[in-house]
Amino acid sequence: MPYQVTPTPLEGVLVLEPKVFGDARGYFFESFNARDFAQATGLERPFVQDNHSKSARGVLRGLHYQVQHPQGKLVRVTQGSVFDVAVDIRPQSTTYGQWFGLELKADNKKQLWIPEGLAHGFLVTSDTAEFLYKTTDYWMPEFERSLAWNDPTAGVDWPLAELAPLQPSLAAKDAAAKSWDQLRQEW
């Protein structure tokens, strides 16, 4: 099996570690194979869109989700490192209201599967980071929402000390993100 799969404390969120073949020349690994993904996770998902972002140290993207056409995401870092976060906003979930975060790095090649219906975001902890994600539905800006990265109900413990003296750099839509209480009526 080319993936080692580790469940996280959040229902349905999985850490995937691909099998890497390396020698003095470098390394090779399959970053995605639909058959192997389904076999390793028990999930069959039609990925329809790939996204690639490059961000500077301190950039915080998220916490994003779509109220209609929710997106499952398979995410990884190809350069640098990020602290990647999923927040369970599914009212019927056994882990509703909880969050999980881990460091994704180009060096560790870990990937995170975030099922449909969770809010997702990341904080760049290296000088720059390139972040790739596969999604199970298309981006639809009219349905996109942002949960405030520092919402006390979500309670995400971002590694801000690593950035000092920088503060998170946010896009306008993320700076204007709403609170848990403002958004939960749509869940």
Language model features by range: what are they?
Residues 1-107, 126-128, 135-187:
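Non-catalytic, conserved peripheral segments adjacent to functional cores
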Residues 112, 120-125:
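Short beta-strand His + acidic residue motifs that chelate non-heme Fe in jelly-roll/DSBH
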